[in-house]
Amino acid sequence: MGECPHLVDVRLGHRSLATGPEQSDICHTGSEARWTTTWYGSLSFSRHKYKMLADLTPGVEMSCRHWARWLTPVIPALWKAEAGGLPELRSSRPAWTTW
């Protein structure tokens, strides 16, 4: 199996074994299911353990899902802490024409 940068949702029948934040958008990256790590309660299955689970457990449905990635808001206070100060304002005029 190939590698996938997304999290995996393991399902046995209709009951999901994975827990954690809501996941969406099934990842179709090829003809075979791709995966990295999944969570079962507080245990993390590594790639090797997950492959063993999939190979030894009939009826396991593997689907690769990823979390929605959102842009993080820019916080000026963090700029001050990381860059040693706020960026200088070049002009108070907008860069494009506003009507």
From Swiss-Prot:
Task: Keyword check for Endoplasmic reticulum, yes or no.
Answer: yes
Q: Which domain of life is it from?
A: Eukaryota
Q: In which tissues is it expressed?
A: Expressed in the heart, kidney, liver, pancreas, small intestine, ovary, testis, prostate and thymus. Expressed in all of the cancer cell lines tested.
Q: Name one GO biological process term.
A: negative regulation of apoptotic process
UniProt main location, coarse: cytoplasm
| Subcellular localization(s) per the UniProt record | Cytoplasm; Microsome membrane; Endoplasmic reticulum membrane
Can you quote a single GO CC term? nucleus
UniProt KW keywords: Cytoplasm, Endoplasmic reticulum, Membrane, Microsome
Task of the protein:
May be involved in cell survival, proliferation and progression of cancer cells.
What is known about its subunit structure?
A: Interacts with TSPO, IGHM and IGHD.
Can you say what this protein is called?
Protein MOST-1
